Amino acid sequence: MIINHNMSAMFAQRTLGNTNLSVQKNMEKLSSGLRINRAGDDASGLAVSEKMRSQIRGLNQASTNAQNGISFIQVAESYLQETTDVIQRIRELSVQSANGIYSAEDRMYIQVEVSQLVAEIDRIASHAQFNGMNMLTGRFARETGENTVTASMWFHIGANMDQRTRAYIGTMTAAALGVRDVGDESILNIDDPEKANRAIGTLDEAIKKINKQRADLGAYQNRLEYTVIGVNVAAENLQAAESRIRDVDMAKEMVDYTKNQILVQSGTAMLAQANQATQSVLSLLR
């Protein structure tokens, strides 16, 4: 029997230390709900998980971006509806003025209302804003000529670079719609039947332009609504995949934790027994 090196105690101590470390890791995983709390737990799994998390957060923000884009389009469309109502009223007055039964004085009164309605078109265009940005004054108009300033509204609808789309909104001022002269600022004149007759054609073109813009906005909105559905599904599926990598199986981890607790208790008892064994040497010295 030797006393300088108690191999049984050394083995029990080493095993107990390893088991205590396992219990510590079990407690970390059970308290956090994560299988991977640091790179040392699973280096490759952590790298894959972080990439997935980046995509998930990007997709969630892309969904928000698309919903904000829908709100932007709905606001623009509501202002265009107001403009349409005004144009329709001007057209109605033009049809009325084109009838020969009205006197010059009658048409003068009609012209006064037309003048106010034309001013209202410009007011709508100047007040149509979203987050401080004018929507109907050409800021987001598609390029129509070599010297025309081009802009658009970009919607970033993906998690990665260049995953975006753009929307155009034409200029909807009175001049752009043809009811105010660009040069001398004169408004649509319906003070005689012939002018009123020509005005009807001008107003039909204005209505056609607005309808085309509203149809485009409707198409943009439909696309963004499908985008929201698509990115939400992608984020959900990616979240499930990331969970399988990162999250801990609580039942399995609890079984492992219970096993290690038992090993700690038995290891502690065996270490005490191994240390006690060397005490018997003293009986030989009596």
Swiss-Prot record:
Ranges annotated as spanning the membrane: none
GO annotation, cellular component aspect: periplasmic flagellum
The keyword Lipid biosynthesis is annotated on this UniProt entry: no
InterPro entries from the UniProt entry: Flagellin, Flagellin_C, Flagellin_C_sub2, Flagellin_N
Compartments reported by the entry: Periplasmic flagellum; Periplasm
Any one GO molecular-function label of the UniProt entry: structural molecule activity
One Pfam entry name: Flagellin_N
Main location class: periplasm
Keywords: Bacterial flagellum, Periplasm
Known partners and oligomeric status: The flagellum consists of an outer layer composed of repeating units of FlaA around a core that contains several antigenically related polypeptides.
Job of this protein: Component of the core of the flagella.
Family: Belongs to the bacterial flagellin family.
PANTHER family named among the record's database cross-references: FLAGELLIN
Protein name per UniProt: Flagellar filament 33 kDa core protein
Lineage start: Bacteria, Pseudomonadati, Spirochaetota, Spirochaetia, Spirochaetales
